[in-house]
Amino acid sequence: MSYNFTDPYEIARFIKEVKKSTPVKVYLKGNLEGVELGSIECYGNNDFYVLFGESDEVATFLTENKDKIVSFRLENDRRNSAIPMLDLLNINARIEPGAIIRDRVSIGDNAVIMMGAVINIGAEIGESTMVDMNAVIGARGKLGKRVHLGAGAVVAGVLEPPSKTPCIIEDDVLIGANAVILEGVKIGKGSVVAAGSVVVEDVPAGVVVAGTPAKIIKSVDEKTKDKTEILDDLRK
């Protein structure tokens, strides 16, 4: 079954229909020789094993084979999860530990995703864009090339409440720390959003906005460009 991940209602349908998962990992001491594992993955020998599987199946396995088990420790980090994390292995970007990136996210070459960043389903991150620590990009948020999304900033998602129009951050935009871009807002190319601002309406290209709600305070000038310089070395 196919889904259109640019449509919030299609994303919601996908989340509704997809099989939910509660994966667990078990460190186990015992003797599992000859034991039927079903779909549980098992690694190890010499009385020590690591098991991976769905919680219900693993729980049944542990109960039915308790006479063969000396001790075990079970770990899990989600419950009835609908969307897996993005596979990062083949992405040509710098992604630091602790970033949470869900599947169906697009990340451009030489992008930088810092610790604690959260990026939801359907988001698009352009080439050489930096998503700083603890920033949030909601469902279907679109960031262009060479954007800097400051620490703690939020680009609102458009999954709930659903909206056809995502947040769009055009190329070369700098968004300061803890700024909030509300649903459906477009930030024009080369503009600057001051730290702590709340942007409730579209921003044209080449301006600086600040405040709550954010207002245009000036055009981007050479002094502004010096203060908001993007460093290529951080993207290599």
From Swiss-Prot:
Enumerate the Pfam families for this protein.
DapH_N (PF08503), Hexapep_2 (PF14602)
Please name the pathway.
Amino-acid biosynthesis; L-lysine biosynthesis via DAP pathway; LL-2,6-diaminopimelate from (S)-tetrahydrodipicolinate (acetylase route): step 1/3
Question: InterPro entries attached here?
Answer: DapH, DapH_N, Hexapep, Hexapep_transf_CS, Trans_hexapeptide_repeat, Trimer_LpxA-like_sf
* PROSITE patterns, alphabetized: HEXAPEP_TRANSFERASES (PS00101)
SUPFAM superfamilies noted in UniProt: Trimeric LpxA-like enzymes
Catalytic activity annotation: (S)-2,3,4,5-tetrahydrodipicolinate + acetyl-CoA + H2O = L-2-acetamido-6-oxoheptanedioate + CoA
Q: Which Gene3D superfamilies match?
A: Hexapeptide repeat proteins, Malonyl-CoA ACP transacylase, ACP-binding
Q: Which GO terms describe its biological process?
A: diaminopimelate biosynthetic process; lysine biosynthetic process via diaminopimelate
Q: What class of enzyme is it?
A: transferase
Q: What is its EC number?
A: 2.3.1.89
Q: Tell me which UniProt keywords the record has, alphabetically.
A: Acyltransferase, Amino-acid biosynthesis, Diaminopimelate biosynthesis, Lysine biosynthesis, Repeat, Transferase
**CDD domains in the record, alphabetically?**
LbH_THP_succinylT (cd03350)
- Sequence intervals crossing the membrane: none
Which Gene Ontology molecular function entries are recorded, alphabetically? tetrahydrodipicolinate N-acetyltransferase activity
Checking PANTHER family in the record gives: 2,3,4,5-TETRAHYDROPYRIDINE-2,6-DICARBOXYLATE N-ACETYLTRANSFERASE, ACETYLTRANSFERASE
* Family designation: Belongs to the transferase hexapeptide repeat family. DapH subfamily.
Please explain the role this protein plays, according to its UniProt record.
Catalyzes the transfer of an acetyl group from acetyl-CoA to tetrahydrodipicolinate.
Matching entries from NCBIfam families are given as: DapD_Ac
Official protein name in the record? 2,3,4,5-tetrahydropyridine-2,6-dicarboxylate N-acetyltransferase
